[in-house]
């Protein structure tokens, strides 16, 4: 099973990836988290920490953008990497290592833009996920419908997760 997470930056995709991975592991599955957000500073590191806490392995072959003293810098020798290749390669690894569920954490933006949607579509087309979950902050307010429509048109999501409802 391949699950792709999509949504705006800060919506809770990375945290959901860890929670979902933990729940699946606890239910007897063998999940793999995939670090395909190579643009947000330290996103790969965050997913690695979340995966470690959940006891779920993380496929993170590229460092993505790192931050150094509060300033975003690219990892040595790369700008941010190729998230489509990371996602595609993770599926092959999952088949080889017998992971039964792959959870792909994708990049977000502060707002909807064509670059974000193109990257999400490219990942979707490369891995053909069973589920595309649109993750949205429950506190987003008036912008929720517009954002949901944009993601539905952009990646044709199959489910919605409202995040940050736990207090």
Residue ranges and their predicted role:
Residues 1-167:
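P-loop/Walker A NTP-binding module and the surrounding RecA-like catalytic core of P-loop NTPases
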